[in-house]
């Protein structure tokens, strides 16, 4: 979920780069670009994870209400793995450097997870799963294991990559901004490539060996996408780790290694936190309660509600479902393009609107309206199928409406990935609190709501007929409330 992780890594950057290895000066820009390019490989995999894996696990027989529990690994690893990797990366004395061992380990874990996910159906079949059975339990277990390893691996990769850029910048503010700008650029490249691959329905023809007795066309496409993902990641990682030196670190007598561990600082900060920061945490938490149901089930909504397919139906229904999934991946690609363009204009728009809190409040209204409009698009699609028949594809207008919602949601998503972190920095500066600590506390307001949604959205959807709309409506309400709170109580 790297869009989800992208700005949480700022906590890691601040923490890790603060104890950089002594360098003669900033490294050449070409070396920073080489390290930043790893983000393209990371985001390619995240894009596939966000667009294809929730539908795929349902094709393996998991009921609609359960995939959200598998997604729990995202916030859990964001809460535990990412700070832990940062902590130990700061203190790594390996002769290969502080960052390279963690980056290499993360890339290898991604490769392992991709094999487990892509070949889950094949491994499950060889272990006794019956192809004609609706639930392939062994494949589901292997898939879930690979899914969790993938989340852990991505969190192992991202923090050290950003910290490596901080080390290479050697404290130069302009170089640091430039390095992070390149990292964001390659994230956008990876997103677009990943969603484009996910939207292409005939990718398996390039890798014909991916289609097997246990692995149908959708499975073979997924497998092919992940082959491209791991190839890209391994190539850019090997080039960066070979080309860019990571000097061995030796702890100094006056280093901060013996200070309170980061988690202890975080929990201690809640005791002394002032009202402006509490208000920021409330708005952020509501914002992520609004976002997470859609991020979990957006492509499933396209396949299930808009296209009228069924992951557990006959071949025709599964084909409809798969068509919707691929169109949903196209929508996510449009979302990423709008997000990237919007990110470039945030500062200017914020000034014209009179401040960050007004901009955040305004785009949360857009978020609420777009989530509510999924109900209208769904009803129009259902009405069309009642008239034209249950196997009828959605009209061009319905499809365009759904894709427009995906694209428009790139606007509030860009704000969600930037404004909360900027406000946390401003509040921490004005109150005298450490920026690293404030961003760490903000991270808690992101991952805890994600865990709550992961536990709750599946059962809520099941309670109202196993569709996606109940979770989206809850998200729309949370977005509206967060908008009101942003306008009225944020400093």
Swiss-Prot record:
Its main location: membrane. The modification Phosphoserine is found at residue 17. GO terms for biological process: sucrose metabolic process. Expressed in anthers. Belongs to the glycoside-pentoside-hexuronide (GPH) cation symporter transporter (TC 2.A.2.4) family. PANTHER family: SUCROSE TRANSPORT PROTEIN SUC7-RELATED, SUGAR TRANSPORTER. Signal peptide: none annotated. Residues 1-13 have a biased composition (Basic and acidic residues). This is Sucrose transport protein SUC7. The keyword Transmembrane applies. It is found in: Cell membrane. Pathway: Glycan biosynthesis; sucrose metabolism. Residues 1-25 are annotated as: Disordered. It holds the Pfam family MFS_2. Residues 1-32, 89-100, 160-180, 245-276, 345-358, 424-443, 490-491 are cytoplasmic. It comes from the Eukaryota. GO terms for cellular component: plasma membrane. Residues 54-67, 122-138, 202-223, 298-323, 380-402, 465-468 are extracellular. It is a multi-pass membrane protein. Keywords: Cell membrane, Membrane, Phosphoprotein, Sugar transport, Symport, Transmembrane, Transmembrane helix, Transport. The keyword Transcription does not apply. GO terms for molecular function: sucrose transmembrane transporter activity; symporter activity. The chain crosses the membrane at residues 33-53, 68-88, 101-121, 139-159, 181-201, 224-244, 277-297, 324-344, 359-379, 403-423, 444-464, 469-489. May be responsible for the transport of glucosides into the cell, with the concomitant uptake of protons (symport system). Does not seem to transport sucrose.
């Amino acid at each position: 979920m790297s869009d989800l992780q992208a700005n949480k890594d700022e906590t890691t950057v601040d923490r890790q780069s603060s104890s950089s290895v002594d360098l003669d000066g900033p490294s050449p820009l070409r070396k920073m670009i080489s390290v930043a390019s790893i983000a393209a490989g990371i985001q390619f995999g995240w894009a596939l994870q966000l667009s294809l894996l929730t539908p795929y696990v349902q094709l393996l027989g998991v009921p609609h209400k359960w995939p959200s529990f598998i997604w729990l690994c995202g916030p859990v690893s964001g809460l535990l793995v990412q700070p832990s990797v940062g902590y130990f990366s700061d203190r790594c004395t390996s002769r290969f450097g502080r960052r390279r061992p963690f980056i290499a380990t993360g890339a290898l874990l991604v490769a392992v997870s991709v094999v487990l996910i892509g070949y889950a159906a094949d491994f499950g079949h060889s272990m006794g799963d019956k192809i004609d059975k609706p639930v392939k339990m062994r494949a589901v277990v292997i898939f879930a294991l690979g899914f969790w390893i993938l989340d852990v691996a991505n969190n192992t990769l991202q923090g050290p990559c950003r910290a490596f850029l901080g080390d290479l910048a050697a404290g130069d503010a302009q170089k640091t901004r430039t390095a992070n700008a390149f990292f964001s650029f390659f994230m956008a490249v990876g997103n677009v490539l990943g969603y484009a691959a996910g939207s292409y329905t005939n990718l398996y023809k390039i890798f014909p060996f991916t289609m097997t007795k246990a692995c149908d066309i959708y499975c073979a496409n997924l497998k092919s996408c992940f082959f491209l993902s791991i190839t890209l990641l391994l190539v850019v990682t090997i080039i960066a780790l070979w080309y860019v030196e990571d000097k061995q670190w030796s702890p100094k007598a006056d280093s901060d290694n013996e200070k309170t561990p980061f988690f202890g600082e975080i929990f201690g900060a809640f005791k002394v936190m002032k009202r402006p920061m509490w208000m920021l945490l409330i708005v952020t938490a509501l914002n992520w309660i609004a976002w997470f149901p859609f991020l979990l089930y957006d492509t499933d909504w396209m396949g299930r509600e808009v296209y009228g397919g069924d992951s557990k139906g006959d071949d025709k229904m599964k084909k409809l479902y798969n068509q919707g999934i691929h169109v949903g991946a196209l929508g996510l690609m449009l979302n990423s393009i709008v997000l990237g363009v919007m990110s470039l204009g945030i500062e200017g728009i914020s000034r014209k609107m009179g401040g960050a809190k007004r901009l955040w409040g305004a785009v949360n209204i857009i978020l609420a309206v777009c989530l509510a409009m999924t109900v209208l698009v769904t009803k129009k699609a259902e009405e069309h199928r009642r008239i034209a028949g249950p196997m009828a594809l959605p009209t061009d207008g319905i499809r365009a409406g759904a894709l427009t919602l995906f694209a428009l949601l790139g606007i509030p998503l860009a704000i969600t990935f930037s404004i909360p972190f900027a406000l946390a920095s401003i509040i921490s500066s004005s109150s005298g609190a450490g920026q690293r600590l404030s961003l760490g506390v903000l991270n808690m307001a992101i991952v805890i709501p994600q865990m709550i949604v992961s536990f709750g959205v599946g059962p809520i959807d099941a309670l109202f007929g196993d569709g996606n709309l109940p979770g989206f409506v809850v998200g729309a309400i949370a977005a509206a409330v967060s908008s009101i709170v942003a306008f009225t109580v944020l400093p």
